[in-house]
Amino acid sequence: MVLSQNLFYLKITTKMIPSRTYQAHQSRLTMVLFVLEMEWMLSTGQDKLFTWHCSETGERLGNYRTTACASCLQFDVETRHVFVGDYSGQVTILKLEQDNCSLITTFKGHTAGVTTLCWDPVQRLLFSGSSDHSIIMWDIGGRKGTALELQGHNDKIQSISYAHHSRQLISCSADGSIVVWNMDVERQETPEWLDSDSCQKCDQPFFWNFKQMWDSKKIGLRQHHCRKCGKAVCGKCSSKRSTIPLMGFEFEVRVCDSCYDTITDDQRAPTASFHDSKHNIIHVNFDPTRVWLLTSGTDKVLKLWDMTPVVS
């Protein structure tokens, strides 16, 4: 842009000129992230490698081999931690130095591949979306190992963004649904499912418990689990369905009859709003300054959404 005689002249170039080529992977790339503060180029690929290069010289600084094909990544500038999600459903946390890295830990919570990650450096929260239709919030800053599960989609999660000023999470799935989650509420962790050979409510044997079936002369039943208490129950003792928004269940799920009676109407109040983008979403970009959401779909259409009515 040139300033002359109080007029602005904008020169528009329609040609991009490549300046450097990085020989980073031996297979298809899945994610590239440029870290301006470090002048690093981070990348993941289907060759199960995470690599980082110096953007100034093009030199490879290091790499790390993941257990499965990496699919997404995020980076924390302050601590130099990188979060790598892969198709096995786990998130690997690495500490990067100038020319080496060290494994910190791995998060395992999804039953299918991790498709997207979102990192909030202010509250130190990591959000992971997966092909299992779920989102998990990992509270790293709290240092208590808290992991909150969010269930509000019927297809794989394509993208997630976090508006830390209003503490709202925006998630989009392949079926076109956009969900805005209120994270400024006191949520509860989902309980672990308990193992038992018989119903923990009526003591009826499950179908693999041959000894109790023979002793009681009763036919074995199928095992289910209450989403509120985690107990192993039979179908008769878990005939009720209910939403449990504070546990992340915005859709009705199976609960045992005794837990159903303890859920109040206030506890069933939704903590998320649902919207239809009317196209199958591939990728999303959220602008928190203007509160705009850009979605791209398989229909070759870009849609720009004004999110001010739903994002405070």
Describe the residue ranges of each PLM region.
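WD40-repeat beta-propellers
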Residues: 7-12, 50-55, 91-96, 135-139, ...
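Short C-terminal beta-strands that terminate individual repeats in beta-propeller domains
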Residues: 10-11, 18-24, 44, 60-66, ...
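Conserved strand-to-loop turn within each blade of WD40 beta-propeller repeats
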Residues: 1-5, 37, 44-47, 78, ...
